[in-house]
């Protein structure tokens, strides 16, 4: 029987998922996947529909990444192939043989309409940790990150008004403040 991810850290962007994933990954019973945010179960959020700006920032090529094992640690990628997702799981198992939990920490699952059903189908007994943050603090933190990476040029109030007019905002296309 093949191993499966059985611990999912799902959270709003800029809510502390990276810090919590790093902390959890230090526990001997938790094996983090080589890609912190593989986004595999957010099947409605895929690179072909992302904005060109987001794709440039993402710099993701699934085929190229999986050509050479062991796979490098990476913050984010959108794994479409079930086989490739299993390769991440298998590497985590090999790296952390004493694990109890295999950790997938994808923030995209919070924004995906498909992820809940996909996760339940994949691992109905999985543990899920949901991380949230004060929405105003989270939005401003997200704004400063977008500004840092050149994804935003407007002031915060103008940017928030623009995003608020979108219904709904789309992951990988808009900032989703």
Where are these regions (language model features)?
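PAPS-dependent sulfotransferase catalytic core
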Residues: 1-100, 105-106, 122, 135-166
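Generic, ordered loop/turn and secondary-structure boundary motif
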Residues: 41-42, 110-111, 172
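Acceptor-substrate binding/catalytic loop of class I
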Residues: 75-76, 170-177
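Short, well-ordered alpha-helical scaffold segments within catalytic/effector domains
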Residues: 82, 86, 113-116, 177
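ATP-dependent NMP and nucleoside kinases share a basic, alpha-helical "lid"
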Residues: 111-129
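Short beta-strand/turn micro-motifs composed of small residues
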Residues: 132
């Amino acid at each position: 029987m093949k191993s499966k991810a059985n611990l999912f850290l799902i959270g709003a962007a800029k809510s502390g998922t990276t810090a919590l994933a790093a902390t959890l990954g230090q526990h001997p019973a938790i094996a983090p996947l080589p890609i912190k945010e593989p986004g595999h179960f957010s099947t409605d959020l895929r690179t072909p529909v992302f904005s060109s700006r987001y794709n440039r920032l993402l710099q993701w090529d699934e085929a190229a990444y999986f050509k050479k094992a062991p796979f490098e640690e990476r913050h984010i990628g959108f794994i479409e192939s079930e086989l490739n997702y299993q390769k991440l799981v298998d590497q985590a198992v090999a790296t952390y043989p004493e694990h109890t939990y295999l950790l997938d920490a994808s923030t995209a699952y919070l924004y995906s309409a498909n992820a809940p059903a996909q996760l339940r189908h994949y691992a109905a007994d999985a543990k899920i940790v949901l991380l949230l943050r004060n929405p105003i603090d989270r939005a401003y933190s997200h704004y400063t990150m977008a500004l840092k990476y050149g994804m935003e040029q407007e002031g915060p109030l103008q940017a928030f008004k623009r995003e608020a007019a979108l219904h709904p905002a789309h992951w990988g296309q808009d900032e989703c403040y």
